[in-house]
């Protein structure tokens, strides 16, 4: 049975931990609003870009002159998995869930006889995947010094991916990230970015556009921007998801710390009461002996 001193030290330790988790919860709560607004503000642009690119891709089709970023290499032998996680932990299952989805995809591709290459964005994903799939890991894009996510950051990542594609390092690129739904709900998602794929809705499919100077020229010019836009949207979704997950995790940790403090306090009081009772019994017994 722990001594009164040990119990008191544990109570102090848990109280200090609760202060830290509460502070982290408040920081995440302050960040989540801005992150959520940024993610939601980027969605209409990404959707409109998708509609325009879908129209252009439909006009050009899969002709011999179609850009390689759209038509691909004609093979799907080598897959590049771009896994985007957080730079920090203490966010529940946020990082682990993205890594889990990426691992499952990697194992599926390997079972099909494909070649897998892994590029990570985010320290936590790098650590987990190098530990489990180190032989397929090729590089890491460091964002630890980035204070605010911006489009140029996404362009840096997309240019890295496009340069590798043009150098013939892979055939298909897929990004892994988490879509923000709410503070308690983030959905790990995989999205193919090269060869580019664009969803077609009925309104876009029925519309007829004239492009100048021409469909193919505009498509070729916009494809790198479309890849960067998809990555930027994924970064913003990931950032909102991270802050939501961290806020939820730290709230749970704060509540658990409070429950533990209550239990330890009850145990401390009972032990103290037992010690006092024992001393009183000893005093009474001594007095009776006299």
UniProtKB/Swiss-Prot annotation:
- List UniProt keywords, sorted A-Z: ATP synthesis, CF(1), Hydrogen ion transport, Ion transport, Membrane, Transport
| Any GO molecular function | proton-transporting ATP synthase activity, rotational mechanism
Q: Which cysteines are joined by disulfide bonds?
A: none
| Membrane topology category | Peripheral membrane protein
Q: Note the SUPFAM superfamilies from the entry.
A: ATP synthase (F1-ATPase), gamma subunit
Top-level taxon of origin: Bacteria
Q: Which GO terms describe its biological process?
A: proton motive force-driven plasma membrane ATP synthesis
Record's subcellular location: Cellular chromatophore membrane
Signal peptide (UniProt feature, chain positions): none
Q: Name one Pfam family in it.
A: ATP-synt
Gene Ontology CC annotation, any one: plasma membrane-derived chromatophore membrane
Alphabetized HAMAP family for the sequence = ATP_synth_gamma_bact
Please give the function described in this protein's UniProt entry.
Answer: Produces ATP from ADP in the presence of a proton gradient across the membrane. The gamma chain is believed to be important in regulating ATPase activity and the flow of protons through the CF(0) complex.
For this protein, the record's PANTHER family field holds: ATP SYNTHASE GAMMA CHAIN, ATP SYNTHASE SUBUNIT GAMMA, MITOCHONDRIAL
Subunit composition and interactions: F-type ATPases have 2 components, CF(1) - the catalytic core - and CF(0) - the membrane proton channel. CF(1) has five subunits: alpha(3), beta(3), gamma(1), delta(1), epsilon(1). CF(0) has four main subunits: a, b, b' and c.
Instruction: State the similarity comment.
Output: Belongs to the ATPase gamma chain family.
Q: What is this protein called?
A: ATP synthase gamma chain
Q: What gene is this protein translated from?
A: atpG
